[in-house]
Design a protein with these regions (language model features):
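Short beta-strand/turn micro-motifs composed of small residues
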Residues: 9, 50-52
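Short phosphate-binding loop-to-helix
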Residues: 53-119
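N-terminal nucleotide-binding beta1-loop-alpha1 segment
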Residues: 1-16
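Conserved core of the sugar-phosphate nucleotidyltransferase
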Residues: 104-196, 207, 211, 227-257
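A short, N-terminal amphipathic alpha-helix
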Residues: 29-46, 59, 65-66
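Conserved beta-strand segments of alpha/beta enzyme cores
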Residues: 45, 69, 180-182
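Short, conserved phosphate/pyrophosphate- and ester-handling motifs at nucleotide-, phospho-/glycolipid
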Residues: 202
Length: 257
């Protein structure tokens, strides 16, 4: 079974332009993410999936320099980009680690791989419930990737709203009746602040990440992050104010998807 990690990344983010090349501990985010994911044993390749747009030339130039595998494809439809990349690399199962999910843990990547290998799922994603998808839980959706069977992408490509094919693609799998899906439920026994955001969407997230990585360096788990936050409560103030902004943007994108 050919299992590859796909990292969707593009430089034209409106909230934090060129975020994948922003540096943390003097290492660009995309390179730091790849370094962390190299600890996963059960994957063939780690592939950055970017677009054919000229605005992503700089990213591709960097990937070539660092000898990181990449694929350039459709700039308006991420699922088509995934499908085309899968055809090129003969991928059967995609482990979807978004380029701004820098905190994704190799341990949970391996868990998702195991679930996909041992069950007949088309799609699996981390969640805090077995029934209702909750994308606002930024602990789970910051450290746990999604698993996608390539053959299932064909089933959902026609369901995507023509006006917006870059966001809300996971929700298509979640909401489709033709998809065999599963929620990987993770309930931490540790206290998790509701305002914790383990992603890089806004400048405040970048500032927060720089603080975390300056303390913990490259290899750490969510438990280490929670301990740092408990010992340094002021760190959360950097990201508390943007949660409402994120939720507003998410809801607007879902309305258009």
């Amino acid at each position: 079974m050919n299992i590859d990690i796909f990292i969707p990344a593009r430089l034209d983010s409106s909230r934090l332009p060129k975020k994948h090349l922003k540096k943390i501990n003097n290492i660009p985010i995309i390179e730091l993410l790849v370094q962390r994911l190299k600890k996963v044993k059960d994957v063939r390749n780690i592939i950055v999936c970017t677009t054919n747009k000229k605005s992503d030339d700089e990213l591709v130039k960097f990937l070539v320099k660092k000898k990181i595998l990449y694929f350039r494809g459709d700039d308006t439809d991420i699922l088509k980009r995934f499908y085309d990349a899968a055809q090129k690399f003969n991928t059967e199962i995609i482990i979807d680690v978004e380029g701004d999910k820098l905190y994704t843990e190799p341990f949970f990547v391996s868990k998702i791989i195991s679930e996909m290998k041992n069950n007949d799922y088309d799609f699996i994603i981390g969640n805090d419930s077995t029934k209702i998808f909750n994308p606002s839980d930024h602990l789970i959706h910051g450290i746990i990737p999604a698993g996608i069977k390539v053959s299932s992408i064909k089933k959902v490509l026609k369901l995507k709203n023509e006006s917006n094919k870059e966001t809300g693609y996971k929700e298509i799998f979640v909401n489709s009746k033709n998809i065999k899906k599963s929620f990987f439920v993770f309930n931490s026994k540790l206290e998790v602040p509701p305002s914790l955001r383990l992603t890089i969407d806004y400048p405040e997230d970048l500032s927060f990440a720089r603080n975390i990585f300056s303390i913990l360096k490259k290899d750490f788990t969510y438990k280490d992050i929670l301990k740092i936050i408990k010992d340094n409560p002021d760190l959360l103030k950097k990201i508390e104010k943007i949660n409402k902004k994120w939720l507003k943007n998410y809801n607007r994108e879902m309305e258009n998807s």
